[in-house]
Swiss-Prot record:
A biological-process GO annotation: base-excision repair, AP site formation via deaminated base removal
Compartmental location: Cytoplasm
SUPFAM superfamilies: Uracil-DNA glycosylase-like
Gene Ontology CC entries for this record: cytoplasm
Protein name stated in the entry: Uracil-DNA glycosylase
Enzyme type, top EC level: hydrolase
Family, per entry: Belongs to the uracil-DNA glycosylase (UDG) superfamily. UNG family.
EC number of this enzyme: 3.2.2.27
Residues annotated as the enzyme's active site: 65
SMART domains in the cross-refs: UDG (SM00986), UreE_C (SM00987)
InterPro entries per the UniProt record, alphabetical: UDG_fam1 (IPR002043), Ura-DNA_Glyclase_AS (IPR018085), Uracil-DNA_glycosylase-like (IPR005122), Uracil-DNA_glycosylase-like_sf (IPR036895)
Top-level taxonomic group: Bacteria
Length: 225
């Protein structure tokens, strides 16, 4: 499962692929993919990093592990492939976006448009066994994605980290550089969205920060497919 990242993440993350934890993760993944149905497809595991280069990252939206249903996960946190029903948390994200900007809720959950504008849609665990949430937790991915966060933390150019829920907020300890910005609330899940996600205005907060930095704002509107 070693991967040659074709953009500037390549040299930055190359040392990780040689570390003992990743070698063990690699053995585990080869076995998992050969015996079980695992998401996303092997070639899509690193999609978040492929779509959003290190230099171009403006925003990080941190997720947990991939969706574990058929045809959902494709390597971007919260995003699903075209033609698949929009999951409940993403639907709540769209509702908040509608309330902030008046955008119609789209007929899909395909967030590539965000990724292409510099929104790194990163899960902390990059693979999952079909139908078994968190089945690849604690196998090594957390070391790898912590390193991604640490590398962004080392950057002088500010990054806006969106941390929804306790799992994402646990990564705050990795964000020590005062150049960066943190936007946090409860998770958009139906279990918690009404306890402070709705009305938190994360999207306009991001764009206010970007505008103040002289950066191009994110066009958050997802088109119908």
């Amino acid at each position: 499962m070693k991967h040659v990242l074709k953009n500037d993440w390549g040299p930055l993350l190359a040392p990780e692929f040689e570390k003992e934890y990743y070698r063990e993760l690699d053995v585990f993944l080869k076995e998992e993919y050969s015996i079980h149905v695992v998401y996303p497809k092997v070639e899509e595991i690193f999609n978040a990093l492929e779509y959003t280069s290190y230099e171009n990252t403006k925003v990080v939206i941190l997720g947990q592990d991939p969706y574990h249903g058929p045809n959902q996960a494709h390597g971007l946190s919260f995003s699903v492939q075209p033609g698949v029903k929009t999951p409940p948390s993403l639907l709540n994200m769209y509702k908040e976006l509608r309330d902030e900007y008046g955008y119609d809720i789209p007929n899909n959950g395909y967030l590539v448009k965000w990724a292409e504008q510099g929104v790194l849609l990163l899960n902390t665990v990059l693979t999952v066994r079909q139908g078994e949430a968190n089945s690849h937790k604690g196998k090594g991915w957390e070391h790898f994605t912590d390193r991604v966060i640490e590398l962004l933390n080392e950057r002088e150019k500010p990054v806006i980290f969106i941390l929804w829920g306790r799992h994402a907020q646990a990564k705050k300890k990795l964000i020590t550089n005062s150049n960066h910005h943190i936007i946090e609330s409860v998770h958009p899940s139906p279990l918690s969205a009404r306890r402070g996600f709705f009305g938190s205005k994360p999207y306009s907060k991001v764009n206010t920060i970007l505008a103040n930095m002289g950066e191009r704002e994110i066009d958050w509107e997802i088109p119908n497919l």
